[in-house]
Structures are given as structure tokens and as C-alpha cells.
Amino acid sequence: MEARAAMAMGWYLHIDMDAFFASVEQVLDPSMRGKPVIVGGRNGRGVVTSASYEARKFGVHSAMPGFQAKKLCPDGIFVPNRRRVYSEFSHKVFAILERYSPEVHAVSIDEGIVDLTGTDRLFGPPLKTADQIIRRIETELGLPSSAGLSQSRVVSKIAATLAKPRGLIYVPPGSEKEFLIPLAVELIPGVGPKTHKLFSRKEIKTIGDLLKRPELAARFLDLGEAQRRERRHDHSIGNETTLDKPLRDKEPMEAVLWDLVEEVGSRLRREELYARCLTLKIRYTNFQTISRSCTLPAPTRFDREIFDVVSDLLRQNIGQGRAVRLLGVSASALQSSGWQEPLFTRERRKSWEKLYQGIDALRHKYGENTIGAATPRNRSR
């Protein structure tokens, strides 16, 4: 009876790819395997976007300035950030995840949550399925990953972080609090520097300390989540990239922006969601960071519409010789359907749906670079 009750409550597998960008480079060039690979920050410019575990032994980590990474690891292999290549591998990873569940939610380009509830009839117990998924990703793609499995999304995320690299941590039903109590609060998703300062002022150092403050714990830990089966759309879908070298001109920035938009649009359609709010993130070379948002009259999940909005936001916030080092695009206020729209826009939306269904099908079958719109990136090809 206990086993049946546990199965009824829901299971969440959080998959987190290990040093994803660097691992992809090692797959594409096997001579790099076992060597310190550093993505981004070439020639001491820009920042590191990914470092293999061999490079991390020297203290190199993502978001580190390239010149500092070079000092720490002079023999490191520096490679440029190839966002579209990593996006293609990301799609391959998620295609594997979707073989095991219709409920797969992308957290980022290299992280996803697989709802394994009820899949035991096809694949066996969730723990066995989790192990099989990790092995399949490595066997088919050559990429290492880590995972956490529990009946809470938050617990699974934390478990996946602790499992790195190439590990799987299973948290049995009923043992979630025991698992969490000794852990540092920084491991909780969403706890950044500001929240950490707040916790420090309240002498909250461990998750156990946080659990003693129910009013705060309820905001950051949702351990009763497994008992609720409704699909939530209160998250956002986004991507950002640190540029290998700062950009000042609009056209190359728009080319980068289009790559980000395609990934966001693809993920929205994959999750069958629409976004009513779009946000552009810009970080300048002086590390000033701004975010500009636009609420849409009607939700969208189409690349062209998303690009038109965020490129307008870009044009409004660049110029005067200011160099940009990071760009990001995110979609929020997500919904599945159910809004009223005028007949003429409804017909246009149907034509967009057909167009992007065809585009997504071609990309899924032949790769991300198979087809693209006439954008700043490929007009000059």
C-alpha cells in the first residue's frame, strides 16, 4: 500500500548536464577529452561561459574573466562560444527525455525536469528509469549528466546539484526534510546574494534553520508540491549569453539576439506555452545590468514576433558608444491557451502555427541550422 501511495504522489527527475558547453566540445573533438577545456574568454577577452572539470581543478569557473582563467590554467584549451551548436545538442538531450514522459519542462539549455509520475507501467520504478535516462544520454550523445529524483521539484534540483559530476541522488518519500536539514541555504534554487544577506541577518545558515521559520520556508521550499498535480505556468523561459568580445553595433547584437529568440521560441512551443511578457537583459562592459520588459496585447510563441519586440527594446537601450558584453531574452506571464482575440488576428495566428510546426519538424529531423528566417544573422550569407 505504501508503494502505491508513493507512486500516486508524483515523481520528479531533475537532469543537469555536466559542464555542458565544454562537454559538447569534447564530444566534437575527442582529442580534448581529459584536458582542461574553457569555453569563452579567448585571448584574455570576455568571460568564461563553461569549464570542463579538468579546468575546474585549476579554479576556473563560469563567469570568470578570460585573463584570470588564463593565469590559473595557462595550458587550458580555449574555444569560442558556439551557442547554436550547444542548442542543437540541447534539443537532442530533450528528445531523449521526451521518450520517457510527455511532461518534460526545460529549466535552461542544459537542465530539465522530467515528470515520471505513472511511467512505471512502461519503464519500471522511477529510480530504474532515472538511471536508464542518464545512461542513454551518455551512450547516445557522449555527454555526462547528473540527476536528482524525489517527489519535490525543489528537492530534486538540490539533489542534482549535489550529485555532480556523473551522479544520481535519490531522496525516498518521507525523507525530504532529513535530506535537506544539514544543507546550506545557498543550495535552494532562487537564493541569490540578496536573499543570502537576508538569511544571514536572521542567522539562517542551513535549510534546517530555514525550516524553523515556516513563513520563510513556505516561500522557498514547496515540499507539498508532489501532492498537487496541476501544471503550473508561473515560471519563465529564457536564455542569455556572454559575448566573446564586447559589441557596440546594432546588427551583430541583433544576430546574437536572434539566436537567443529562436531558443526561447522553440522551448515555448515544445512546452505548448504562450508568453504575454518579454524581457531583454543587457549587461554593459562596466558591468551595469539593465532589464527592459514589454507586455504584449496578445500572447505569442513565435520567433518573429518575439524578435520584433526585443529588438525594439535593444534599439532603445544601446548607442552613445556603449559596449555590450551580455544579452539575454526571457518570456514570462506564461499560459497554455484560453484567451479571446479578434477574428483577423486569430487567422494570422493559425498561419503562424502551421509555419512554425513545419520549421520545428525540419529542425528536429535535420538539425537546428536546417532552416531559418531572413534575420540579421543570415541575410549576409
Give the positions of each predicted feature.
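DNA-contacting surface of Y-family translesion DNA polymerases
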Residues: 180, 187, 193-324
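Residues in well-ordered beta-strands of folded domains
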Residues: 38-40, 79, 115, 238, ...
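Acidic, metal-coordinating catalytic segment for phosphate/diphosphate chemistry
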Residues: 298-381
